[in-house]
C-alpha cells in the first residue's frame, strides 16, 4: 500500500507508534548494556577472588623443608 493513499492523521499515528517502539528498543539496549557492564565487573571480581584463593591454597600445600 502506497503512503500516498493513507490519510495524514494515520501516517502521523504510525510515525508516533514507530517512534515509541524505537524508544523502547533504545531503552532496552541501555538496560542490557548496564547489565552487561555489571556482569563484567562481577566476573572480574570473581576471577580475582578465585585467583587469590588458589594462591592461598598453594601456599598452604607447599611442603616445608
Curated annotation (Swiss-Prot):
Keywords: Coiled coil. GO terms for biological process: vesicle-mediated transport. Disulfide bonds: none annotated. InterPro entries: SCOC (IPR019357). It comes from the Eukaryota. Residues 8-44 form a coiled coil. GO terms for cellular component: cytoplasm. Belongs to the SLO1 family. This is SCOCO-like protein 1. It comes from Schizosaccharomyces pombe (strain 972 / ATCC 24843) (Fission yeast).
